[in-house]
Design a protein with these regions (language model features):
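Inter-lobe coupling/hinge segments of SF2-like helicase ATPases
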Residues: 1-376, 410, 420, 428
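Conserved beta/loop motifs at nucleotide-recognition and modification sites
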Residues: 151, 384, 391, 445, ...
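Generic C-terminus detector
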Residues: 435-462
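Generic hydrophobic alpha-helical scaffold/packing signal
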Residues: 305-308, 383, 387, 421, ...
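Short, low-order "capping/linker" segments at domain edges
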Residues: 410-423, 456-462
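Short amphipathic alpha-helices in soluble, non-transmembrane regions
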Residues: 378-385, 431-440
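Short helix-loop-beta junction
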Residues: 227-233, 384-392
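Short beta-strand elements
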Residues: 389-407, 448-456
Length: 462
């Protein structure tokens, strides 16, 4: 079950589950609602994956829904991951969950050897390309032995940003407060948030300058450079630009195991299993460490660990090369060592000190509208209403209020976005407060046209 099913296919799948013809249901996030009648076990694979959280209404987390379903059906819930979420591992350590550990890798193969390459040193040696000398040599050796290479670069496009040479301002999307990305195939700038496309401007919209610098590198440029470095190797680029059609992703995977030697990915690698891949290269993940969310370290550690694990899954031992300008950062070092227990202890200490989940819940009160001054006023009014409620209702539970402030991306798809973040608990008294505050704000005529929402433990880095 997945979003690509037609209405007819989805109806057929639901009927097969309801009448018991289908004994096993497999699917993406929404499959947690599958109408299985006699539920015996519910398995959430890669339970720490961020896509299990719906950021649009209805806002829910598939793991929370799975937990409730298993309580209702009196059956076990299995949360599986090589890199569990900090919250899940915390509950396992406390004994709320039962912790089951796999001590050996599949087929008893050794973990890949990971080399961390300091890209600052590469620049000092005059190497201005995105590929370190160590990675180029390793790719050449791997290809010469008839094996395959996987490369990760989580940035689409050709150049990641275009800026003016006179004022240094980027070219922003007219609908979003986000710099646009240059795509060479279409020779256009594209916003990866709203999809807006436009040609390169002749003059800077900020100062009128006529010269621009093209900065950063994306998967399109990497594909081009790989073809120059290894002209005999067949390169497969997989990102949202090449796998946008309904079956393109599956078709690419079906052919890639036999037809390509170099694979370039821009997306998540979890679950991929290709026995001839003996080298994995992470081109750049430094920016992911500073994504504006308290989960940034966790997600970076998880992605690197999962990527490294794609190497050496066959009969030949694998290796991985991690390129970074932050070679001494503890997250990158522990990810290279694949040392989750030590990483957990580090993250545990930070979250306990800063009071982040699992030591509290975060409720994001969101305010969205076309006029910034009205959106900002609504967010400020929500803070005032919280203060009124706490005083009038003698609210004695611990509560921390952060904001009102603009969201990480203040404007998306033509709408301004502000938020108030509450550090609280997802319990009835807090939910009553949140409901009362939102109702008090929406009751005011000035804010009637705004979109307001409450999102428990959502992504604050957007």
């Amino acid at each position: 079950m997945h979003s690509a099913l037609t209405d007819r296919q989805r109806q057929d799948a639901y009927q097969r589950m309801q009448n018991g013809t289908a004994k096993i249901a497999i699917g993406t996030r929404s499959a947690v609602f599958a109408p299985v009648q006699n539920l015996g076990i519910l398995i959430v694979d890669e339970e720490g994956e961020r896509t299990y959280k719906s950021e649009n209404a209805p806002r829910y987390h598939a793991v929370a829904v799975a937990r409730k379903r298993c309580q209702t059906h009196h059956c076990p819930l299995l949360l599986a991951s090589a890199t569990p979420s900090i919250e899940s591992y915390y509950y396992a350590k406390k004994g709320v969950y039962t912790l089951l550990e796999l001590k050996k890798r599949y087929r008893n193969m050794p973990l890949p050897e990971v080399t961390v390459v300091d890209m600052n040193r590469e620049r000092q040696l005059g190497n201005g390309t995105p590929f370190s000398n160590a990675l180029i040599d390793a790719m050449q050796e791997t290809l010469s032995h008839g094996k395959q290479v996987l490369l990760l670069l989580n940035r689409r496009g050709y150049h990641t940003m275009i800026s003016c040479c006179s004022c240094n301002e980027p070219v922003y999307c007219p609908n979003c407060s986000v710099p646009m990305t240059y795509h060479k195939v279409s020779d256009q700038l594209m916003c990866h948030y709203c999809g807006h496309m436009q040609p390169m401007p002749e003059t800077c919209p900020h100062c009128g300058g006529k010269q621009f610098r093209r900065m950063g590198f994306g998967t399109q440029q990497m594909e081009e450079q790989l073809q120059l470095l290894f002209p005999k190797a067949r390169v497969l680029r997989m990102d949202a630009d090449t796998t946008g059609s309904r079956y393109a992703y599956e078709e690419s995977l079906q052919h890639s195991a036999q037809e390509y030697e170099l694979w370039l990915y821009a997306d998540d690698w979890k679950g991929l299993d290709f026995p001839d891949v003996t080298l994995v290269g992470v081109l750049s993940l430094d920016q992911a460490l500073f994504a504006g969310d308290f989960r940034s370290y966790e997600r970076t550690f998880s992605l690197i660990t999962q990527v490294v694990g794609r190497s050496g899954r066959g009969d030949t031992a694998g290796r991985a090369i991690l390129q970074t300008f932050l070679p001494n950062h503890y997250v990158l070092q522990l990810a290279a060592q694949q040392n989750y227990p030590v990483f957990y202890e580090q993250e545990y200490a930070i979250r306990k000190t800063m009071l982040f989940p699992p030591f509290c819940d975060l409720c994001i009160l969101g305010f969205v509208g076309e006029k910034e001054e009205i959106v900002a006023a609504a967010a400020a009014e929500a803070v005032r209403q919280i203060q009124v409620y706490v005083k009038e209702q003698a609210f004695s539970y611990p509560l921390w209020v952060l904001g009102a402030v603009p969201c990480h991306y203040e404007r998306l798809k033509g709408k301004y976005r502000y938020r108030v973040i509450l550090k609280c608990k997802n319990t009835s008294p807090y939910r009553t407060l949140i409901r009362a505050v939102l109702e008090a704000v929406t009751a005011q005529k000035a804010f009637a046209k705004l979109y307001l929402y409450a999102d428990m433990n959502g992504d604050i880095g957007v």
